[in-house]
From Swiss-Prot:
Family recorded in the similarity comment: Belongs to the class I-like SAM-binding methyltransferase superfamily. RNA M5U methyltransferase family. TrmA subfamily.
InterPro entries per the UniProt record, alphabetical: MeTrfase_TrmA_AS, SAM-dependent_MTases_sf, TrmA_MeTrfase, U5_MeTrfase_fam
SUPFAM superfamilies: S-adenosyl-L-methionine-dependent methyltransferases (SSF53335)
Record's keyword terms, sorted: Methyltransferase, S-adenosyl-L-methionine, Transferase, tRNA processing
Listed EC numbers: 2.1.1.-, 2.1.1.35
Native species: Helicobacter hepaticus (strain ATCC 51449 / 3B1)
Function: Dual-specificity methyltransferase that catalyzes the formation of 5-methyluridine at position 54 (m5U54) in all tRNAs, and that of position 341 (m5U341) in tmRNA (transfer-mRNA).
Name recorded for this polypeptide: tRNA/tmRNA (uracil-C(5))-methyltransferase
Keyword Methyltransferase in record: yes
GO-annotated cellular components: cytosol
Active site, per annotation: C358 (nucleophile), E392 (proton acceptor)
Amino acid sequence: MNCEHFGICGGCTNIQDYSTQLQAKHNLTLQEFQSFLDTKSKNFQYPTNPLAIEVFASPQEGFRARAEFRFSHVFQNKSGLDFAMNAFGYNHRVPIKKCPILLPTLQDIMPLLLHYLNTYDLLNHKLYACNLLSSLQNEIIITLIYHKSLDSHWESLALKIQKELEYTLNTNIHIIGRSKNHKHILSNDIICEHLTLFANTPKERTYTFFKQESRFCQPNPFINTQMLEFIVSALSSIYTPQTPCDMLELYCGSGNFTIPLASIFRHIFATEVVKSAITLLQKNMAKNNIENIIPARLNAFESIQALRKERVFFRLKNIDLDAFAFDCVLIDPPRSGVGEEEVLYFLQNFNTIIYVSCNPHTLLNDLRILSQSHYVMRFGLFDQFPHTYHRECIVILRKSNKIL
């Protein structure tokens, strides 16, 4: 990657050439998960022997849809403030003027935004951080975070800058100001993302997702598309319209996986503990004209209690849990993984498990239990964050049939 800050800025920690990075990630993943892929010593019927890890590469530049920058007055000079990132290998910040891993529209806005921040003291006074969020359709949210209260004078100036940026870049820009316990939204805090799956094939379909400031969303839309295609293709080979059944999703968020999978299942019972994420999921359902997703505000343990009828939840009073015929479960846990044996043993009740992991080490631990009842049907390695050592994995597991 051609970046003047490569090896200096700590945003990118892997400075090898991209093909070497990807091969190293593949080799390490293969080494760690070999026992789950090599079936020679297993007493189960498997489709292939051994199973290959499917590797999905990212664009090397211009792939990241969000960024978090800091500012420090230490870097003030005659040309003004710069964005700042943590230094590579050191506990201090370094100034940067550009970031090639960002989507092109975010790269374009960085120098323009810096110009305005350096021009107006009202904008840069006690400015602490800046978050950027974009869609592939070039709509942008700029969040400016301050150690001061923001008044009507700030709002008037920020609105003026917002309009000038929109005119210059010919796209929708939304500036948000944040200070302690306050959020100033000048126009909107939600943008639209259109993702097309299986482009230029008979299966091509486009979905619309709302992305909200401060809410989690997939940072690499190119890899996200490949992740969705991977899961949809795997499940489409298992489930057909002639075999209608339902899916349970734990940690569904705002529906990144839920929305595209709705066409495969009769119903999806989508559970999530964050109330605002469920609200966004409902917006995504309406936008995509989907009616067979049933959201519920439950954590993983509450979901298990509800489905086992161990506890009655008032918030589920209008949902008939007995009407579901679950065959598949999708779980996208935090970096800490599932961990809890009670949840893992509960997952073993489903014929199909889709496990989305952002931490191979916790995935490895969880598979030690899940592999007692299921085999790995497909294993995908997704390079969500090029130029880092991060690895994203998706494992499709099917219930095993012992050979008698």
